[in-house]
A protein has these predicted regions:
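A conserved amphipathic terminal alpha-helix motif
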Residues: 75, 82-122
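Short, conserved beta-turn/loop elements at beta-strand boundaries and strand-helix junctions
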Residues: 40-45, 72
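Hydrophobic/aromatic beta-strand elements that line small-molecule binding cavities or substrate pockets
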Residues: 32-38, 61-69
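Short beta-edge strand/loop motif at the mouth of beta-sheet-based domains
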Residues: 1-33, 42-44
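Short, solvent-exposed aromatic-acidic interface loops
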Residues: 50-54, 79-86
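A short, polar/proline- and glycine-enriched secondary-structure boundary/capping micro-motif
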Residues: 33-35, 56-60, 86-91
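Short solvent-exposed strand/turn elements
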Residues: 46-60
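A generic structural micro-feature
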Residues: 13, 28-30, 55-59, 70-72
């Protein structure tokens, strides 16, 4: 889990327009990772913000979660687009961010299918 507090239980998402994807920190502080800009329950969730270390640069990001019904289940499509200025450029960023997001999607799939984010038995 990639969080500043190293504990996913500190993450919250208020999935409505203007809602916060936020994290409580152990010292009483907090982090606003992203802000919800579009919410259509069961269909689409769009957030705006630069996640993780991208917050330190002059970047803007948009993350879109598209949900669609398929074969008795749900297909999840995640798109995260980032632009702006970053000292040193972007060469190393896409691979790292894609890897983190892919890992989170893998954990989400395991949670839905097994009830545990690590995919283990209950």
């Amino acid at each position: 889990m990639h969080t500043f507090s190293h504990d996913a239980r500190n993450l919250t998402l208020d999935a409505k327009a203007g809602g916060c994807f936020c994290e409580r920190l152990p010292d009483g502080g907090g982090v606003e990772h992203m802000r919800v800009v579009y919410a259509s329950p069961g269909k689409l969730l769009r957030l705006s913000g630069a996640i993780g270390p991208l917050q330190e640069a002059a970047l803007a990001g948009t993350m879109t979660w598209n949900l669609s019904q398929a074969g008795g289940g749900t297909t999840v499509e995640l798109i995260y687009t980032v632009g702006g200025f970053r000292a040193g450029g972007f060469r190393d960023i896409p691979t790292v961010v894609d890897g983190v997001l892919r890992g989170q999607l893998t954990r989400l799939k395991a949670l839905v299918e097994t009830g545990r984010p690590d995919g283990g038995s209950r």
